[in-house]
Design a protein with these regions (language model features):
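Boundary at the C-terminal end of the N-terminal hydrophobic targeting segment
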Residues: 2-9
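Residue-level recognition of the N-termini of beta-strands and the immediately preceding loop/turn
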Residues: 83-85, 127, 172-176
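Glycan-recognition patch characteristic of GH18 chitinases/ENGases
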Residues: 10-119, 135-136, 143-158
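An acidic- and aromatic-residue-enriched active-site/binding cleft used to recognize and process polar
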Residues: 90, 132-134, 179-183
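Hydrophobic residues within beta-strands of alpha/beta enzymes
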Residues: 44, 127-129
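Aromatic-lined carbohydrate-recognition surfaces of secreted/lumenal glycan-active proteins
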Residues: 149-183
Length: 183
């Protein structure tokens, strides 16, 4: 997110987006969600949820700690009604099972359903996928397949469809974003 001083110096044009990631481990270093200059942001992505290797569904690495942070972020959103809160899945250290979760239609459906359930249960506004990286690269131990590129697109499609269905049920417009490599 940068330091509060850096954030205070920035201005954003009407209609623009200012997205920040809040890393769950930042609280261990004394930077808690209530210190985020939310008035300067339109969206906060909570980093990171992971993919459970056994069920290939969304999971929190440290549920008690993460739940506390998510509660603090929801409180911050109450004080900043313009703010969207998303769960970010993956990142450098937790992308190893994306390829497995995206490999088949059944797995994509299950993973997407778990994300939608998580968003609804946690009172969030959407999901950010941070798969580092489809096909090749990323941290040691990350699983890759040649079909990752196509499967990632299909995973995004499945997740978007399930989020839209949920949105029609509860009258909300859920966001789906990705963190992608450039170049």
């Amino acid at each position: 997110l940068g330091t509060p001083t850096e954030a205070e110096e920035r201005t954003y044009s009407a209609g623009g987006e200012a997205v920040g990631y809040y890393a769950g481990w930042a609280a261990y270093q004394g930077f808690t969600p209530d210190q985020i200059p939310a008035e300067h942001l339109t969206q906060i992505n909570y980093a990171f949820a992971q993919i459970d290797p056994d069920t290939l569904t969304i999971a929190l690495e440290n549920p008690a700690h993460d739940q506390k942070n998510l509660a603090a972020l929801r409180k911050l959103r109450q004080q900043n009604q313009h703010l969207k809160l998303l769960i970010s899945v993956g990142g450098w250290s937790d992308s190893q099972y994306f390829s497995d979760a995206a490999a088949t239609a059944a797995r994509r459906e299950s993973f997407a359903a778990s994300c939608v359930d998580f968003v609804v249960e946690q009172g969030l506004d959407g999901v950010d996928l941070d798969w580092e990286y489809p096909v090749s690269g990323g941290a040691a131990g990350t699983i890759h397949r040649p079909a990752d590129k196509q499967n990632f697109t299909l995973l995004l499609q499945e997740l978007r469809e399930q989020m839209d269905r949920q949105g029609r049920r509860d009258g909300k417009d859920y966001s789906l974003t990705i963190a992608g490599a450039a170049g």
